[in-house]
Amino acid sequence: MVKICCLGAGYVGGPTMAVIALKCPDVEVVVVDISAARIDAWNSDALPIYEPGLDDVVRRCRGRNLFFSSDVERHVGEADIVFVSVNTPTKARGLGAGKAADLTYWESAARMIAAVATSDKVVVEKSTVPVKTAEAIEKILDHNGRDGVGFQILSNPEFLAEGTAIRDLLAPDRVLIGGRETAAGRAAVQALKDVYTRWVPEERILTTNLWSAELSKLAANAFLAQRISSVNAMSALCEATGADVAEVAYAVGKDSRIGAKFLNASVGFGGSCFQKDILNLVYICECNGLPEVANYWKQVIKINDYQKSRFVNRVVSSMFNTVAGKKIAVLGFAFKKDTGDTRETPAIDVCKGLIGDKAKVSIYDPQVTEDQVQRDLAMSKFDWDHPVHLQPMSPTAIKQVSVAWDAYEAARAAHGVCILTEWDEFRSLDYARIYGGMQKPAFVFDGRNVVDAEKLREIGFIVYSIGKPLDAWLKDMPAVA
């Protein structure tokens, strides 16, 4: 029986291994993590991450050929193929701080693999890593491994979207495998390919050299984020000219050379990948003497920050240029619907901006806990040309935040409602009921364009929708960028 071990039981490692176990019942799959609490959650009925369809896949495979364990060294030592899906955050200090990927966890994983391996291993990069990381990992493994034990490094980046991860894994657009162009490297690529061909058509499995695979993941995320920043830049121009960004995006998306995906204007992109990977790409360009290319990609982040700042400014300016002492309901805190992931969510920066103007913020999200909200708002992060309101908040300021159990409670007695995540339930709320319980004039600031603005105006709301023509009230109170 082929044995697979995955280091890291997070948003990538857990779902990916669960689907491999589902589709390869004769392969033993073990997910390991140094966090005993996380492993306990994977072994319970309350999984540590929310992902549609994940519960069912885990339930069908767990205890059969899918296992979760904190006995890391044992299972790594027994495995034929070791996936490494550990965190690669942006460095917070030192050389490359604010841009470069921090490979501390990756290096620790490589040293541990070298120490415990008594047989040949195929080591698979699943985390998103900088170009040439495989070369560094090879050196660590070769210099620290036992005599006679061989290692082959593969790059097999994930192309998952949170909220649709199981669907993406079951029917991927493509599976990318990069390896050394040697006999041993090609054999390792084939071994991993044999796993995926159990359910993925062979024509969708792409093989490249290591460096192309590593860079392809960064490039894919950069291109997707670029599209979001492009349509968000257009949303600002639409508001200034009276155009409708939804109509513009639809017209542009009908061009077969462009396509319609990732053209929804919003308060900004978030998640664990886009900003981190673009900053990493910027750093790689700078290190390779390509400042013009670095500056090009840096603008994607700058537009994203601008969009969040613009949203906050619109809220404040619309409400008589102050939100001090006013209750603002925030509907949605996760970075997108159908996930509880709050990493780099635009809601953090919007909330900080409102609280910085002394607003009282009441937050509701169906999948985000109060503890998570408080942790996110208190967390420090590296300042990289960010506006002041994106800085860490003081404990005193965080006391201005409350978390509600539903949207109606969050909006009760509020002056304004900010919709920051496109949860389906926010489309069908009883907005007449919400309006009745709010201070007047009552505002809705739709950061995801999920509500019917005209229907809300008929109820009595003053409505701001990103990239849509402004009503008279908003025109009279222009937001300062």
From Swiss-Prot:
Record-listed Phosphoserine modification sites: S394
Residues bound to substrate: 158-162, 217-224, 257-270, 335-336, 448
Keyword Nuclease: no
Alphabetized InterPro entries for the sequence: 6-PGluconate_DH-like_C_sf, NAD(P)-bd_dom_sf, UDP-Glc/GDP-Man, UDP-Glc/GDP-Man_DH_C, UDP-Glc/GDP-Man_DH_C_sf, UDP-Glc/GDP-Man_DH_dimer, UDP-Glc/GDP-Man_DH_N, UDPglc_DH_euk
Keywords associated with the record: NAD, Oxidoreductase, Phosphoprotein
Catalytic residues (UniProt): C273 (nucleophile)
SMART domains (UniProt xref): UDPG_MGDP_dh_C
One BP annotation, GO: glycosaminoglycan biosynthetic process
Any one of the GO CC terms: nucleus
Catalytic activity: UDP-alpha-D-glucose + 2 NAD(+) + H2O = UDP-alpha-D-glucuronate + 2 NADH + 3 H(+)
Described purpose of this protein according to its UniProt entry: Involved in the biosynthesis of UDP-glucuronic acid (UDP-GlcA), providing nucleotide sugars for cell-wall polymers.
Family: Belongs to the UDP-glucose/GDP-mannose dehydrogenase family.
NCBIfam families in the record: NDP-sugDHase
Name by which UniProt lists this protein: UDP-glucose 6-dehydrogenase 1
The organism of origin for this protein: Oryza sativa subsp. japonica (Rice)
Gene designation: UGD1
